[in-house]
Amino acid sequence: MSKPSLELKGASFTLSVLHINSSDLNAVMAELDSKLAQAPQFFLGAPLVVNLSAIQDNDFNLHGLKELLLSRQLVIVGITGATIALSNQAKTLGLAIVKAGKQSVTPPPAPRQTKVLKQNIRSGQQVYAKNGDLIIFGAVGNGAEVIADGSIHIYGALRGKAMAGAAGDSSAVIIAHSLEAELVSIAGQYWLAENLQQHSSDKSGCIRLNGESLIVESLPL
């Protein structure tokens, strides 16, 4: 029997959500450009859901926002939290109306294994610890990426990007002897360098989630 030419299957994907808090597109783009400049490769070509719950102006220029994001190689796949008028505008632009999913009461499975590296991770290199924690005895240089479904422990300086809880584990942490990162992320919540500098002074620390916000705690290393 021949295989069907198509199949419809359920699947879940992790999408970044861009919260728009102002109707002033010039102000929105200026702030976005500042964030993109700090981590351009992290957002390049990224599919986005735009949250418009803070926008009550039914004349908001959604088409203009879409074009401005496309010019920066960001792709809107849908909107959420919009008024009826803005939802109708989105439909004419071919955008999906995304409803926020219910929060799962089942915690993600605990990491099953640990990946240990005794080396520096240099610019352009990427390391991924699937289904587990990542321990690095060395530094993570600028332009390098370290990713783990569990926690990330760096016994050295973190100057690149570190993304823990990549599969949704909100209990994951990022620990480093020196926090100088370009970007840190836990379960999709992220800080860019400017956010990290506001909360840390390049010293050893542990970054974790507190609710839906990241916090950093000093470590006596």
Curated annotation (Swiss-Prot):
Record keywords, A-Z: Cell cycle, Cell division, Septation
Gene3D superfamilies: 2.160.20.70, 3.30.70.260
GO BP, sorted A to Z: cell morphogenesis; division septum assembly; regulation of cell division; regulation of cell septum assembly
Positions of disulphide bridges: none
Subunit structure: Interacts with MinD and FtsZ.
Family that this chain belongs to: Belongs to the MinC family.
Physiological role: Cell division inhibitor that blocks the formation of polar Z ring septums. Rapidly oscillates between the poles of the cell to destabilize FtsZ filaments that have formed before they mature into polar Z rings. Prevents FtsZ polymerization.
Name the record gives this protein: Probable septum site-determining protein MinC
